[in-house]
Amino acid sequence: MNSFPWLTIIVVFPILTGSLIFLLPHRGNKVMKWYTLCICILELLLTTYTFCYHFQLDDPLTQLTENYKWIHFFDFYWRLGIDGLSIGPILLTGFITTLATLAAWPVTRDAQLFHFLMLAMYSGQIGSFSSRDLLLFFLMWEFELIPVYLLLSMWGGKKRLYSATKFILYTAGGSIFLLIGVLGIGLYGSNEPTLNFETLANQSYPVALEVIFYVGFLIAFAVKLPIIPFHTWLPDTHGEAHYSTCMLLAGILLKMGAYGLVRINMELLPHAHCLFSPGLIIVGAIQIIYAASTSPGQLNLKKRIAYSSISHMGFIIIGIGSLSDTGLNGAILQIISHGFIGAALFFLAGTSYDRIRLLYLDEMGGMAIPLPKLFTMLSILSMASLALPGLSGFVAELLVFFGIITSQKYLLMPKILIAFLMAIGMILTPIYSLSMLRQMFYGYKLFNVPNYYFFDSGPRELFVSISLLLPIIGIGIYPDFVLSLSVEKVEAIISHFFFR
């Protein structure tokens, strides 16, 4: 057990310091914005320092563990720890939240509450990724929904209340299954309830019971990821939310579903995962094609990007279902890669909306000449989204592709068929990405906007865009930087399926 509570400080620091926002003077919003930004930067530096100096990459076991008894009656512990699987998403959370805070600079209405909710969400997400106790994982999972709901319902488009209600109904419905699964696993087969991940990972269940648990967790994570048909909240939510909230949703929230699938469904329930993995692969392939073919029909720019996110999540599902080292590494790389790409696309969609007050592509056109910087950034990020070689999306999708082809668990013909379907999805992706660029930036100027709106990206917006673009290029050129974090843990997880 770790002597100094690094992880507890990392989890609690944003919400504790965030609650002091309400004590700051009300003279303008600048003090509060800088205060929030400083908290995010401090938290990111603290996390990076802890992982650099106290985390061994070659050890697949849980490190920096903390174990404090919390509720004596229920044997409930505040149990934290990280391994190769959680280190990437935690660093991604810190990076995206810091940039989302900077992106939220124009927010002036109820700015104190807005920034506090962003910091509360930050704590909940890091808590979810670093929990080593199932009930604590559930509590963090639920705690993080409250700020998201308030961010969606209070700031955004005209239909924001509808989309926020839809979001909370879907996620709360999924959470019921998550709670039943958590309590079922914790109370099964022993006199004393245990919710410790390490203990549960070595416990075996009757296959029928394991399948029931698996389905419960799968529904909860399928809503968050999202897996079709649980995806309909996502386009509505992204279409209405403020773009800084969209960055957090696309960059981190969706990845929590993928993380849960690997952490709980794969690690704790390997027999059921073997049974369900062919189904996951089929659903993933259908999802890639379905979302990629639905996206070109969306005239709302943010909804089109939302459907592209759903399509990219299909690769993560296939990687998780492939039961191979390469496939799972590809899925984890896609989690990180799409976190940057999705956040950057929504940020640029939001900055273009700030200028022209339009979201519908058929009303846009000819923006390349008045907004050259925005045009350049959005073009490069669209290329990253369609998996251009040299950018992070390409490496992740290629690894998933190789992972399914080299998997030892499937016959040759099904593997070829799935690879063919994935290839069709990869061909459909440029269709909606490039048509989006064509409708926005080329052709005649269709909209009537006074010229004073037409200033190109300022220093703040360029800084956020470039900060998101650099990791995308970096991972594309040297993917081992991210893969080295998780490769040992992935081998440990996959070995369960071959030696158990």
Curated annotation (Swiss-Prot):
The GO molecular function terms of this record are: NADH dehydrogenase (ubiquinone) activity; ubiquinone binding
Q: Where does the chain cross the membrane?
A: 4-24, 37-57, 87-107, 111-131, 134-154, 167-187, 208-228, 242-262, 272-292, 305-325, 330-350, 386-406, 416-436, 462-482
Q: How does it sit in the membrane?
A: Multi-pass membrane protein
**In the UniProt record, does the keyword Chloroplast occur?**
yes
Its GO CC terms are: chloroplast thylakoid membrane
**What processes in GO biological process is this protein linked to?**
ATP synthesis coupled electron transport; electron transport coupled proton transport
Q: Name one Pfam family in it.
A: Proton_antipo_M
Keyword annotations: Chloroplast, Membrane, NAD, NADP, Plastid, Plastoquinone, Quinone, Thylakoid, Translocase, Transmembrane, Transmembrane helix
Q: Which domain of life is it from?
A: Eukaryota
Query: What EC number(s) are associated with this protein in UniProt?
Result: 7.1.1.-
Protein name, please?
NAD(P)H-quinone oxidoreductase chain 4, chloroplastic
User: Which species does this protein come from?
Assistant: Oenothera biennis
